[in-house]
Design a protein with these regions (language model features):
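Hydrophobic membrane-anchoring helix/hairpin
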Residues: 4-133
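Elongated, amphipathic alpha-helices that form coiled-coils and helical stalk/scaffold elements used
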Residues: 86-93, 98-259
Length: 259
């Protein structure tokens, strides 16, 4: 058995979600310090046991009932004992980038032409259920940082986002040429759709932003409908301006006649 730890704590940065303490040998005098923004989970033989909130804890078997029960069966309550401690960062971690790896193919809902569209942006995540996250994603890995967590979610995130892009445009009758004006609503709709998928792994999707849309600029069919779309609104604006001008002229002529 190696060195027996006296104090266990984690002072890492804010880009790490989970960190496993390198020391795995403890006794009844070992102190566990959990900061205000953290939780700690004890593992023995691959089983998640007691969870500790913020504060200073002594790892006495009488204070850790799940650990105590296992130790009494396996070591007759003798110390020191061998287990693992994982620290979980509970803060909201922001500016985590995401993006579709390819463009989604669907029928543009307003003008009904085939369209390829990709998206990218940022999201913020927070650990919602430490035990679930450890059991479903972390496993025996010593660290779970932003990059690794984003990589875990990349596959289903790409699939969901591509599907939800088309659904949002169809449900809200928003054309591809108007989507920029609805970016906030679009982002919030995607967040609501994606949140349950993250929660399944013990992670809260706190914020989700679409900041960029990858359109098929330069593609002949896309450019044709783009020109038609903006020409339509230009013609409407021109007609309204002409109507206002004619009204002003009529009012002016009427004023002259009355004079």
């Amino acid at each position: 058995m190696g060195h027996i730890a006296d104090i266990l704590k984690y002072e890492g940065d804010n880009t790490t979600f989970v960190w496993k303490h390198p020391c795995e040998d403890f006794n009844n005098y070992t102190q566990l310090i959990v900061h205000e923004t953290q939780e700690a989970v004890l593992f023995l033989n691959g089983q998640a046991l007691d969870l500790f909130g913020p504060g200073r804890h002594t790892l006495e078997t009488q204070n850790t009932p799940l650990l105590s029960g296992l130790l009494n069966r396996t070591t007759n309550g003798e110390t020191p004992f061998h287990c693992e401690v994982y620290f979980i960062n509970k803060t909201e971690q922001m500016a985590i980038r995401w993006g579709t790896d390819s463009q989604a193919q669907f029928l543009e809902p307003t003008y009904h032409f085939p369209l390829s569209l990709g998206a990218s942006g940022e999201m913020s995540l927070r650990v919602l259920d430490a035990r679930r996250l450890l059991l479903r994603l972390v496993g025996t890995a010593p660290v779970l940082d932003q990059q690794t967590l984003a990589a875990y979610f990349r596959a289903f995130l790409m699939a969901r986002v591509k599907t939800y892009i088309a659904q949002f445009m169809q449900a809200n009758t928003v054309s591809i040429f108007e989507l920029d004006a609805h970016m906030l609503d679009f982002s919030q709709a995607l967040q609501q759709q994606l949140a349950p998928d993250f929660a399944d792994y013990g992670v809260e999707l706190v914020r989700f932003f679409v900041t960029n849309l990858a359109r098929p600029d330069g593609e002949a069919q896309y450019e044709k409908f783009k020109e038609l779309h903006f020409r339509k609104y230009a013609d409407i604006a021109e007609a309204q301006l002409r109507q206002q001008t004619d009204l002003i002229q009529a009012q002016t002529e009427a004023q002259k006649s009355s004079d």
